């Protein structure tokens, strides 16, 4: 399966319990910032944004004072899981980022999709990739 198919079929899929609803944007990006695959709606991410996200995985709380930036948009960092998941909130939407051995799995959502629904979609694929050694 191509990386684009993972984004299209497993991240931009219909949200369970919300017929016709999907995440706003999604991507799989290498730890080095290289884009493996992304939805057409995913923002243009900057190298320093990936560097900040990677640093927060290594040093949980690093992004809390400044916020998490994704394509220039600022998200307030909310509870995550050290070295595994970072979650951000912006207005009625937000972002979930799951770290795997080689990549970062991003899911961006807006209402009516809930933070919990986004977490399930992103973390399910991330856990699968970890199980595959990726």
From Swiss-Prot:
The keyword Metal-binding does not apply. The keyword Lyase does not apply. Its main location: cytoplasm. It comes from the Eukaryota. Belongs to the profilin family. Occurs in many kinds of cells as a complex with monomeric actin in a 1:1 ratio. This is Profilin. It comes from Apium graveolens (Celery).
